[in-house]
Regions:
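Residue-level detector of structural "landmarks"
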Residues: 17-24, 63
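Short alpha-helix boundary/capping segments
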Residues: 4, 26-39
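Cationic, amphipathic, low-complexity segments that mediate targeting or membrane/lipid association
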Residues: 37-41, 45-49, 63-66
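N-terminal helix-forming leader/targeting segments
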Residues: 1-8
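Hydrophobic alpha-helical signal peptides and transmembrane signal-/tail-anchor segments
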Residues: 13-16, 52-61
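Acidic, metal/ion-coordinating pockets
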Residues: 69-338
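N-terminal start and proteolytic maturation junction detector
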Residues: 6, 45, 54-58
Length: 338
């Protein structure tokens, strides 16, 4: 017990109950070092027997590591927000998630936020008021006509960068933060995607170089809205070391291939969606199943019920722009009906 108290001065306590393993998305309350010192000092020695084991590690839990390193910037990115359930869940939880996860900068993909197709100015404003610094999109960006005029005057509402020159709106933005400049690029893939756009590989590389050279942005985040895993992985490999993160969207299914490439670029094929869980990609599953069984066109309403919030947390060294950590984010909740 004395050894535990001694080592605790240079680390934190990790409590491991061998009787059960917490699920990956379970919230873990992190206690600061001083609080743990007090806890252990008054903890009976006999309580350290049996299935209850104590391990000592240097530093805080991963979720709090960034607090002790002033050069680290933590980005939270949330995948495609689907319909009213998805946006209500995100708006209701975003500020709390920011605090719980020690987030510095928030990006959300809002491309399905309006009844599952596109986004409206009101929804975009609501998401920004909730804490989103930038909203990205994809192939459904034009589904709500009123968003066109809004994009002309709101550079934080992005459409894919690789639309032809002269297209209304912005495909990228650089924002100043308390930890330096952060660049965000939104691009759309070409494989199995409509409409066919300009080459995203060339467009993203050119824009990332411009951001670094002309605007001094070291931290650059790319939302690559694409269908195939091969195109997404190729994009990440193509610009490894040039940007801080390449995170895929569009498929609505969170993948488990998070990694940091050799050049320092964090990567995940798809962040997943923020939308109804009892569904097919956020839509009521029965009409989708019937469409597959009969080939008869049907409407696919946004589903209801439990909602999942899916995304990713990326830690970046603000001085070098290199990613130092990446972790999937996953949270389920019940929405109260009005």
């Amino acid at each position: 017990m004395q050894d535990a108290q001694q080592h605790l001065k240079t680390g934190v306590v990790f409590l491991n109950f061998s009787a059960a393993v917490a699920p990956a998305n379970q919230k873990v309350k992190v206690i600061e070092t001083k609080a743990i010192e007090s806890l252990v000092a008054n903890f009976p020695a006999q309580n350290f027997t049996g299935s209850f084991q104590v391990f000592l590690f240097f530093g805080f839990f991963w979720a709090k590591t960034r607090r002790s390193n002033k050069s680290m910037l933590r980005i939270l990115f949330l995948g495609d927000i689907v319909g009213e359930p998805g946006r209500k869940a995100v708006i209701s939880r975003l500020k709390a998630i920011k605090e719980e996860q020690s987030v510095d900068f928030i990006i959300v993909n809002g491309e399905n936020a309006a009844a599952g197709r596109g986004i409206t100015p009101k929804i975009a404003i609501d998401l920004m008021r909730a804490g989103a610094a930038v909203i990205t999109s994809g192939d459904h960006i034009w589904d709500q006509q009123e968003i066109v005029e809004f994009m002309e005057m709101e550079p934080r509402m992005l459409r894919p960068l690789n639309y032809p020159e002269g297209t209304v709106g912005f495909g990228s933005i650089v924002l100043k933060t308390g930890k330096g400049k952060v660049g965000v690029i939104n691009a759309q893939g070409r494989t199995f995607m409509q409409p066919p756009l300009e080459n995203p590989f060339l467009a993203v590389e050119a824009e990332a170089l411009r951001m670094r050279e002309e605007e001094g942005a070291e931290v650059i985040f790319v939302d690559f809205h694409a269908e195939t895993t091969s195109e997404k992985i190729a994009m990440g490999r193509s610009i490894d070391g040039l940007v801080s993160a390449v995170i895929g969207t569009h498929t609505h299914v969170q993948t488990a291939d998070e990694q940091i490439f050799p050049g320092g670029t964090a990567f995940l094929c798809d962040a997943g969606m923020c939308g109804p869980l009892e569904s097919v990609l956020g839509r009521e599953f029965k009409p989708v199943v019937e469409r597959f069984r009969t080939a008869i066109p049907r409407r696919f309403p946004v589903a209801k019920g439990r909602v999942g919030i899916r995304g990713v947390l990326v830690d970046v060294d603000e001085k070098t722009g290199k990613a130092t950590g990446i972790r999937r984010f996953s949270e389920d909740l019940e929405l109260r009906e009005p």
